[in-house]
Amino acid sequence: MRLIIVSGRSGSGKSTALNVLEDNGFYCIDNLPAGLLPELAERALIHTELAQPLVAVSIDARNLPSHLERFPQLLEEVRAKHIHCDVLYLDADEETLLKRFSETRRRHPLSSPHRSLAEAIEDETKLLGPIIDLADLKINTTSLNLYQLRDAIKLRLLNQPEPGTAFLVESFGFKRGMPVDADLVFDVRCLPNPYWKPELRDQSGLDQPVADYLAAQPDVEEMFQDISSYLLKWLPRFAASNRAYVTIAIGCTGGHHRSVYLTERLGQVLQKTLKNVQVRHRDLS
């Protein structure tokens, strides 16, 4: 059996996450009272129609505060049944959450005539503290549109061929901000930039002319060797410590050339020695 618990602040994308999981064969329950989590898991284990039932539930600030406080104990009870359980926590910065509520004109579940929207969001953060601390995977949706969020959930949660730590090597551009959910970040902006070559400007690190240009630069090769040596040494230690997800982010200025090239090469190297290595280019469209 596989159980995914979806949580996060209101407006961060929990409904989208449940829709993606439902589209991929999960039986989904929105706003499950946290106290019912062990009972739900027990019932799913004896489900007769599915050999490996897939269940996803959302647990958020609509729960009783006393249930949320007990979440660590409840999660421990579920995992004691040897259930493959992931806790996904979605979030966005406060400015983005305020903007989303303004655009949709929906009411925050904790809002009241005597509590502003900003205060409701702050209170929600405190209530969800026990879940935040135990999240296996955190996805910040601040800069993600609906389709990017759907892709991110499918990539991180549904495309794991084998159990164990899931590694994501991701390229990005600093001009659009650092990935806030990255565990390791490498800044490669000091390397020669193909952008300043007119014939390469409109191409990306996936294109052979750009790859050939970067491969011929000694600094690029040295950077690749240093990063790959570090990752090959230390990522197995992350896996040994029972980490469910590890994100490695490689950043250049625009996220089109240097970071893409190095991310591709690093992904190829890591896939030879580690299981569940995925590659993503955040700022390539």
Swiss-Prot record:
Sites where the protein binds GTP: 60-63
Keywords carried by this UniProt record: ATP-binding, GTP-binding, Nucleotide-binding
Alphabetical list of Pfam families matching this protein: PapZ_C, RapZ-like_N
Chain residues that bind ATP: 8-15
GO molecular function: ATP binding; GTP binding
Family: Belongs to the RapZ-like family.
HAMAP family linked: RapZ_like (MF_00636)
PANTHER family: RNASE ADAPTER PROTEIN RAPZ
Biological role stated in the UniProt entry: Displays ATPase and GTPase activities.
Name assigned to this protein: Nucleotide-binding protein PFLU_0879
Lineage per the UniProt record: Bacteria, Pseudomonadati, Pseudomonadota, Gammaproteobacteria, Pseudomonadales
